[in-house]
Amino acid sequence: MFLKHPAWLWLKKHDKGKLPPVDDALQAMFDDGHEFEKYAEQLFPDATTVGFSFEENNYRTMPVRTKEVIESGAKIILQGRLEAGEITCIFDVIERVGESEYDLYEIKSSTEVKEDHILDLAFQTVVLEKAGLKVRKVFVVHVNNKFERTGDIEVAKLAAQTEVTDQVRAKLEYTKKQIQHALMVAHSPLPPDFSPRHVGLRALDEWMAIYEAMFPQDHPHNIFKLTHLNPQIVGELEDLGVKTIAEIPEGFKLNSKQQRQVTATKADRREVNKENIKDFLAKFEYPLYFFDYETFSAVIPPFDGLHPYQQMPFQYSIHRLDEDGTLTHKEFLHTQNSNPGLPLIKQLVEDIGEKGTVLVWYESFEKGRNEELGLMFPEYAQQMKQLNERIVDLMVPFASGWFVDKDFFGSASIKKVFPVLISEISYKKLHIKEGGTASRVWKETFLEGENTDQRDKIAEDLLAYCGLDTLAMVQLFEFLRTEVS
């Protein structure tokens, strides 16, 4: 928390009400972590669990209970807490390898070791060694993304162990200095600077949610709306006294997308390369199929043939536009607790025909899912390959800078582009407004059996959301065609 932003720690101690509650998306991430943790702990049979919960008495008594388990001679201990002066940590696993000597394991539901894992383990190592334990080796237990489910989950194949002892040891002195700084911040009655320039560990988006709630920005095109923003740029602009994108001086170092955004904002008009867009549209072959998937993923693959976190389509929408202007709609939504792949692919090959351009938004996503479906169901591999050969990315004019509007805020996302150009229809009126919610709600309802009294309504909401994605593409295509005609 402190390493993400010093003021985050200060707020946690002095003004918790300023911190946002855990939302559904973040809770889903926590749930994934807990699910993997339950499997990973099976790698340590006969372990003694101290146990952690947010109940005050449970947390308060953890150090005493942990010491009792250590003194009992337990070889492996799960979910313990130790204190050393003013600092404390909860560890996932320690394994006794000698007299007061232990290996330390951190369980993470990511598919690789990350910088914050090393720093977290360095902090734990400092606490454990100050508390009288010697740490021999340090490991991260993480998800093996090469794992493919076949029958029951084999934990030894699902989880990978990566030793990080040297990386952790290299961070110990840095960590000790940061601990002293953190304690000074925590004890101070005054907060540190709240500026996003002080963000670390790639936590800018997380901190901006807190910062903008505390300090609402009056100008819609303030510097915090610059695309690909990072803390260094924030600091440099603040030092120059720049508060809005239009004030960014000539010669300020920006990438190409940032520069396009700044240019469009200063000009206060759309920049349209009609020739490039006209050439792009001329290559389309009717009928046109506007196509979009909705997918789910899970850290523990629920079906055979799936990898951890593999994006599996459970829904699609297709709007077909004929050359005479006739528009028709096809859709699919899997509502059973079973692998949606085969029923989806069977209907898809019927609905999307064999000829005509297939238009998507961000082609690598749909193409990737089609390749995976072809691998999972080899009898359809050729049809998926042919489908991918027909795909064209309707995002290209916006991502390539052929059509730029300052109100896109440097983004080519359909959620940014569509409301600026087409005002008659809005995602705001839908109960499900973005793909993350669609994925989470489908998984909870149709895979995990929750929301049983709302199944029909949720299915209706999912169909409405996915249907609007492809209708939005139709309308954006029509807009572009009119713009360059």
Residue ranges and their predicted role:
Residues 74-80, 84, 88-92, 104-107, ...:
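Conserved DEDDh/DEDDy metal-dependent 3′-5′ exonuclease domain
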Residues 1-100, 232-257:
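Metal-dependent nuclease catalytic cores that hydrolyze phosphodiester bonds in DNA/RNA
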Residues 82, 276-354, 375:
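Conserved RNase H-like, two-metal-ion catalytic cores of nucleic-acid enzymes
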Residues 222-288:
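N-terminal accessory regions of nucleic-acid-interacting proteins
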Residues 104, 290, 315-317, 359-360, ...:
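Structured core elements
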Residues 97-109:
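Residues forming anionic-ligand binding surfaces in small-molecule and nucleic-acid pockets
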Residues 41, 125, 371-374, 474-481:
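Short, amphipathic alpha-helical segments that act as regulatory/interfacial helices
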Residues 153-222, 234, 417-485:
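Acidic, Mg2+-coordinating catalytic module of metal-dependent nucleases/exonucleases
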